[in-house]
Amino acid sequence: MSSNDSIMLTPLKEQDPTVAEIMRHEADRQRSSVVLIASENFTSRAVMDALGSVMSNKYSEGYPGARYYGGNKFIDQIETLCQERALAAFNLDPAKWGVNVQCLSGSPANMQVYQAIMPPHGRLMGLDLPSGGHLSHGYQTDTKKISAVSTYFESMPYRVDPNTGLIDYDMLEHDAQLFRPKILVAGTSAYCRLIDYARMRQIADSVNAYLVVDMAHISGLVSAGVIPSPFEYADVVTTTTHKSLRGPRGAMIFFRRGLRKHDKKGNPIYYDLEDKINFSVFPGHQGGPHNHTITALAVALKQCQEPAYKEYQAQVVKNAKVCEEEFKKRGYKLAADGTDSHMVLVDVKSKGVDGARAERVLELINIVTNKNTVPSDKSAFSPSGIRVGTPAMTTRGFKEQDFVRVVDYIDRALTFAANLQKELPKDANKLKDFKAKLGEGEQYPELVQLQKEVAEWASSFPLADKW
């Protein structure tokens, strides 16, 4: 074997054992952890096979039938198939909807939509981050523009009602009449209730705005029909592909075709979104698409049509409801008083800890969550909650009784965290002091025992991996 052949043909474990060892440790971590991050999931072996394939080798700037490189016969076939399966996964008529499957990730996809629809400094409204929105919907504070979206465009937030935790549609409508946005974004990252898309459509129409729905978190639930679909009301729908959808890491943009509305004289006005959005994706913001990802996405979208997939998504919602009930039994306050989707947002302040402390203690017992703002928070940088999602562990086989056990473990860990916080002196009780005292948890028998129980339990459920 030549030296070049040795480089090209030697398996990873032999050629680069350092990287292979890190990957093995990550596989072990995933296998032995209860993963509750709502934006994470475990994709299938078939999807991973497609990701690590020859489709990664090909360059293909452009779109099917209009490439800037030769040799794209089969790349065209896979991208076209992916588009067809994307429309089928959401029961969409190709005469009324198109889709771009080249987007690299969710936040860039949103930016591509904004740029396609309006010029720099155009106006958009999105749900405020502390209310459960997403950075890419134009988040900014009183003193700083955080998301680049708020730099390139003029953004104004709408918020939840502080008393109910639900989107305040009346205030949104009032503010929209004053702000006159070109785009109204209906989408969330930590809002657990259903969005009233019909009301959003009515508000958008009242100011002649486009309704852009970001269903990144819930697209799997929408595809399976376990929650209402936004497509009846939206002009554009964006989604990531790796959260509840359970595909590879990527994104899609769906756009309307055909008649949009009639003007005051009764003349038809047609959508012109397709060319604008496609141009915004390529060449506006991207070069060559990631063909291995598009291939893997095609595989995942076929899985969306399987009865087992629909059963899985129904179980995701059932498991989230169990989490709601169990947290309430233990006296926790939940944002919006519960969930209709795949996650609950738990306010842990009443336990005497904040989101960051809760996240760290839970990680030490192999329960992986993320700190998150709750509507009552004054700052997105000091969150009082944790976000608990059910898609990942439902993929591995968790049912209702398993999530009862999950909530019990969380409650025990947070009780420990609160007691540890109380032991800190008043002049040294900040997060860094808490983490310093906590260390890796090895000096606390209670944490060691919890970690052992969780790791053994989680490891008993299957995980699709190559290790």
From Swiss-Prot:
Its main location: cytoplasm. InterPro entries: PyrdxlP-dep_Trfase, PyrdxlP-dep_Trfase_major, PyrdxlP-dep_Trfase_small, Ser_HO-MeTrfase, Ser_HO-MeTrfase-like, Ser_HO-MeTrfase_PLP_BS, SHMT-like_dom. Transmembrane segments: none annotated. It catalyses: (6R)-5,10-methylene-5,6,7,8-tetrahydrofolate + glycine + H2O = (6S)-5,6,7,8-tetrahydrofolate + L-serine. Its cofactor is pyridoxal 5'-phosphate. GO terms for molecular function: glycine hydroxymethyltransferase activity; pyridoxal phosphate binding. The modification N6-(pyridoxal phosphate)lysine is found at K243. Keywords: Cytoplasm, One-carbon metabolism, Pyridoxal phosphate, Transferase. Pathway: One-carbon metabolism; tetrahydrofolate interconversion. GO terms for cellular component: cytoplasm; mitochondrion. It is found in: Cytoplasm. GO terms for biological process: glycine biosynthetic process from serine; tetrahydrofolate interconversion; tetrahydrofolate metabolic process. Homotetramer. Belongs to the SHMT family. Interconversion of serine and glycine. This is Probable serine hydroxymethyltransferase, cytosolic. The lineage of its organism: Eukaryota, Fungi, Dikarya, Ascomycota, Taphrinomycotina.
